[in-house]
Amino acid sequence: MLRSIQHVEALSSRQISTTSMLLKNRAGKTKSTSNRTQLLTYEMAQKPHHIGVRKSWLTWHSQNLEEFRQSQPLVVAQDEVVRRFIRGFFPQNLVVSGNEIVIKRRGNVLIVAGFLQYSRRLDIRRIYWMFGFAEEFLSILLKQPVKLEMAFVESEEDVAYNYI
């Protein structure tokens, strides 16, 4: 009898919450720094619920078509392979630490878009060779055509939309 009374008292005290609400529902919101030094690109500045309106070019894909459907784990693995290869093959030229690499699928073609930082040491022949090698290597590795659509910028400040 004594045990059941203690059990009932414990349950009744658990139902009353005396803490204040924290309202931690801020998904997709980047934290601001004290002296506004964190770089924010246009895509990072948009809120997650705008992805279908303002960022629709990031969501165009053909995975919902019957002929081009692939399993989700395969797509995630392919995306990770492509991102790691681009980060490893262009280490000095990445902008915003490679977070702005966009991978689009159109039919069976994989399109990799993003920004690379221009360096004075890079000549045109080497750039064309690196792009051709990266496209060919990824095409052979993934067994589907891969196209690189990389744009060169002078510095990371050219890509910056805002500083927070």
Swiss-Prot record:
Oligomer status and interactors: Component of the mitochondrial ribosome small subunit (28S) which comprises a 12S rRNA and about 30 distinct proteins.
Subcellular location: Mitochondrion
Any one GO biological process: mitochondrial translation
GO cellular component, one term: mitochondrial small ribosomal subunit
InterPro entries (UniProt xref): Ribosomal_uS3m (IPR026146)
Protein family per UniProt: Belongs to the universal ribosomal protein uS3 family.
Boundaries of the annotated transit peptide in chain numbering: 1-23
A molecular function (GO) term: structural constituent of ribosome
Keyword set includes Ribosomal protein: yes
Species of provenance: Caenorhabditis elegans
Identification of the protein by name: Small ribosomal subunit protein uS3m
UniProt KW keywords: Mitochondrion, Ribonucleoprotein, Ribosomal protein, Transit peptide
Any Pfam family: MRP-S24
